């Protein structure tokens, strides 16, 4: 229904209401019939469905397959169900952790929304009552005044200089002056753009000036905001870089496990020398059991726990992560497209300069000649520019409330965009004083005098030139400049028309104001530059203001361009793709421009983050690799589509989150390299032993190492602090595989190294037990191999504190890793030396000398890896890479 094309009286009748509103009974009936006035929350999956989603992870599927095979072995061969129980325990813990962390983020978002739960003043039974905005129904008459959030869509039916900011919907930050008259469609015009419907008010917008009333035409999902929310709910999310890499890793592990099965199965058949059913079944079971033991059971849980730790750390830094895997995506961010207002700046217009003889007199005049108000706690409400003037006066000891008592308003000529000024009349001890404020060029032209030593003296050309120079100097700094003048009346004039009041004025002064940058953002931008991250400013503000802020922050580099939305619209796709990397500032942009900008960067292969707060920002946030919503000023729709919500709306928080994302990805890589290197050593050891015809370790031994010896140090690696160079590296390309940067080589050589040490320990144990060097089964050899493998992998976890740095010169400590290592050593020792445990695991307790030798051999690996890292660092320096 196009209510903006209808007379207000007709709209009221069509909605079965009246200018005195609905009756309480009718409102309750409509509420019961149509539901609450709120946006439908995104349909939440049940706990069961959330758990099933966690189980759909490729790494988890491999573990479930391993558990199934182990279960078959247990049933058919009478084996223990220990393997099955342990693997399923790991799977359940991983799934529960994932669900818990993501629900925790949703609860944080809900808490933010509850903090901003709104109320509305409505007419019910002809009386003004305050109700929760979600209880509004179609036909309610809502009273609007400065500072109110518009709670639903409605037709304006009363207007007293009403101005509404609709930036959340239209992207246009300039408040829209509203009226009551109908809007007529021109020939061939099917609809009127939302921003031009000046007799309508929409959910998500804010009243910044004046008063008025509207009759509610649409609530909840039927509002314009609701329609956008519904469209966004249909869009699907893509995979994060980490999800893609873990999927690739799962495929590699799957083929590796299958390869192990085939090779060991073939070797067992050849050694058996026959193809009887019993031989084939036995060979198959041995191959499968060893392959199951070769899977890094703790990897999925480690990744989930590391991500969860990162999410917790980020929440402490005001970044609420809504998707667990999005944490890592932040680490490879290459471009951050940021709003200006509130994110780079303080979202608070502030007077930073003035011109005039008397600052106190100028502040008093400006504060009285505006409609912004201040409460007892110093909180100012009103149109941003006027709020800045009242706040400025307050800092000078001129409280607006006190000023109003001393100089009560007795008349006014409201602001008009045609006149570009407003005037107010106030009772004063010597009669009536008039204050007029507005555009400098207009005010100056109406001034015949200026204030000097508290007296009005005739305006001179020299002083007029001085005023104009000051005005230009402020404007050149991208300040918003207002002029103020006064006029003294002996008594209140009979005629308060502007033509009567606004002449023969006495100039008082100029104020220059700007939304100042957040003090911490400059350092954050510098940190982005050092980290190889490009910051792009996107704003609905004027281009001159945007450029001034961008230069101050260092966003606008030498040779970079600033373009307006209009200029962007004139560029075709080919031109824009050729130019976009040279553009650092976009001003006066529309919502569709933001999506176009994000798409251009993504198409060029850059991992892109996009911030936003309004409903109109939601599509661009959804289209970015990392959508960042605002927790304070952001709409619910924007928060719901974002991957991350900033609780403080601060750009510096994004940079902190990027650093945390890099740390998390580093730690995940460290854990993966540690676990895969350890598992490779197990696979090689078992493979060599199988080829040579002896048993070095049993599957249960490998499962113990994977889940006890390896898992806790791997988790501790996830708590490793960020390395000193983490924000001096270039962002890693999202397409880089999990084994990029030489990690594949490292896993291979470290796996070979540890397996060589384990085999050496086995033969030393065999020699100590038998006194001869032969290739046969040995109880002492198996125990020593187990001790060496455990010790080598525990020591290897310390190597992994830095993939290239020397662990002996690291300035930080990892207490969690130290305790995990000590616990793993103690558990390994108990399993081998306590008789009933040793018997359960098939070990023969060894002598103290054998124990020391086995552990000593295991420690050799750490020294050798550090020596190799020394050569790797030298190679990196030659290539000019950051260490």
Q: What kind of feature is each model-predicted range?
A:
Residues 800:
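A C-terminal functional module that forms or caps the active site or interfaces directly
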Residues 264, 755-763:
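Transmembrane alpha-helix/helix-exit interface in multi-pass inner-membrane proteins
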């Amino acid at each position: 229904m196009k209510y903006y094309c209808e007379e207000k009286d007709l709209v009221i009748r069509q909605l079965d209401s009246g200018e005195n509103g609905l009756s309480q009974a009718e409102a309750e009936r409509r509420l019961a019939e149509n539901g609450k006035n709120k946006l439908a929350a995104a349909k939440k999956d049940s706990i069961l469905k959330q758990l099933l989603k966690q189980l759909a992870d490729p790494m988890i599927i491999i573990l479930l397959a391993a558990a199934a095979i182990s279960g078959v072995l247990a049933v058919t061969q009478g084996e223990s169900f220990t393997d099955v129980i342990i693997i399923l325990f790991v799977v359940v813990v991983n799934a529960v952790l994932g669900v818990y962390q993501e629900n925790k983020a949703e609860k944080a978002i809900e808490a933010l929304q509850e903090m901003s739960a709104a109320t509305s003043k409505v007419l019910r039974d002809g009386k003004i009552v305050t109700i929760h905005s979600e209880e509004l129904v179609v036909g309610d008459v809502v009273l609007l005044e400065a500072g109110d959030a518009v709670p639903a869509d409605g037709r304006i039916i009363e207007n007293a200089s009403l101005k509404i900011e609709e930036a959340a919907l239209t992207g246009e930050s300039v408040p829209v002056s509203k009226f009551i008259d109908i809007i007529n469609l021109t020939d061939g015009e099917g609809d009127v753009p939302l921003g031009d419907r000046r007799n309508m008010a929409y959910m998500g917008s804010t009243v910044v000036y004046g008063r008025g009333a509207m009759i509610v035409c649409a609530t909840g999902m039927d509002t314009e905001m609701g329609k956008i929310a519904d469209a966004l709910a249909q869009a699907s999310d893509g995979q994060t870089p980490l999800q893609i890499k873990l999927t690739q890793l799962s495929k590699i592990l799957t083929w590796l496990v299958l390869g192990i099965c085939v090779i060991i199965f073939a070797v067992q058949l050849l050694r058996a020398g026959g193809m009887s059913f019993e031989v084939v079944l036995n060979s198959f079971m041995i191959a499968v059991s060893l392959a199951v033991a070769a899977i890094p059971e703790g990897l999925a849980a480690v990744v989930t726990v590391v991500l969860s730790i990162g999410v917790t750390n980020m929440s402490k830094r005001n970044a609420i992560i809504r998707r667990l895997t999005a944490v890592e995506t932040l680490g490879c961010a290459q471009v951050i497209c940021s709003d200006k207002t509130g994110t780079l700046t303080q979202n608070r217009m502030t007077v930073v300069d003035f011109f005039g003889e008397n600052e106190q007199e100028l502040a008093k005049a400006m504060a009285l000649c505006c409609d912004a108000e201040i409460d007892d706690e110093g909180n100012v409400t009103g149109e941003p520019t006027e709020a800045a003037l009242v706040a400025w006066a307050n800092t000078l000891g001129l409280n607006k409330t006190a000023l109003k008592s001393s100089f009560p308003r007795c008349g006014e000529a409201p602001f008009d965009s045609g006149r570009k000024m407003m005037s107010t009349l106030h009772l004063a001890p010597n009669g009536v004083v008039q204050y007029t404020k507005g555009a400098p060029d207009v005010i100056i032209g109406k001034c015949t005098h200026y204030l000097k030593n508290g007296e009005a003296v005739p305006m001179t050309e020299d002083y007029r030139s001085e005023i104009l120079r000051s005005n230009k100097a402020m404007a050149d700094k991208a300040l918003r400049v207002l002029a103020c003048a006064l006029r003294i009346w002996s008594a209140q004039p009979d005629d308060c028309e502007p033509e009567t009041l606004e002449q023969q004025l006495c100039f008082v002064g100029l104020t220059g104001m700007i939304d100042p940058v957040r003090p911490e953002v400059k350092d954050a931008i510098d940190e982005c530059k050092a980290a190889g991250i490009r910051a792009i400013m996107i704003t609905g503000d004027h281009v001159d203001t945007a450029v001034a802020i961008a230069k101050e922050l260092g966003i606008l580099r030498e040779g970079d361009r600033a373009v307006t939305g209009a200029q962007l619209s004139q560029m075709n796709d080919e031109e824009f793709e050729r130019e976009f990397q040279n553009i650092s500032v976009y001003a006066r942009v529309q919502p569709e421009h933001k999506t176009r900008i994000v798409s251009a960067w993504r198409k060029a292969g850059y991992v892109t983050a996009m911030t936003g707060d309004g409903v109109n920002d939601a599509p661009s946030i959804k289209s970015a690799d990392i959508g960042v919503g605002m927790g304070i000023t952001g709409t619910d729709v924007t928060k719901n589509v974002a991957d991350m919500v900033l609780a403080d709306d601060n750009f510096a928080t994004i940079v902190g989150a990027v650093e945390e994302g890099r740390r998390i990805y580093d730690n995940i890589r460290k854990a993966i390299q540690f676990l895969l290197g350890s598992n490779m050593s197990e696979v090689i050891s078992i493979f060599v032993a199988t080829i040579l015809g002896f048993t070095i370790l049993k599957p249960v031994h490998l499962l113990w190492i994977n889940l006890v010896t390896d898992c806790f140090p791997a988790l501790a690696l996830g708590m490793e602090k960020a390395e000193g160079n983490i924000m001096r590296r270039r962002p890693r390309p999202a397409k880089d595989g999990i084994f990029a940067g030489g990690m594949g080589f490292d896993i291979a050589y470290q796996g070979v190294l540890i397996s060589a040490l384990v085999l050496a320990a086995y033969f030393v144990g065999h020699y100590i037990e038998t006194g001869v060097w032969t290739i046969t089964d040995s109880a002492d050899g198996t125990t020593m191999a187990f001790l060496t493998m455990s010790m080598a992998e525990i020591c290897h976890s310390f190597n992994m504190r830095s993939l290239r740095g020397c662990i002996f010169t690291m300035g930080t400590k990892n207490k969690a890793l130290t305790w995990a290592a000590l616990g793993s050593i103690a558990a390994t020792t108990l399993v081998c030396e306590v008789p009933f445990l040793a018997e359960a695991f098939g070990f023969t307790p060894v002598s103290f000398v054998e124990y020391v030798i086995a552990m000593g051999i295991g420690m050799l690996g750490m020294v050798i890896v550090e020596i190799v890292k020394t050569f790797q660092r030298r190679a990196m320096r030659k290539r000019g890479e950051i260490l």
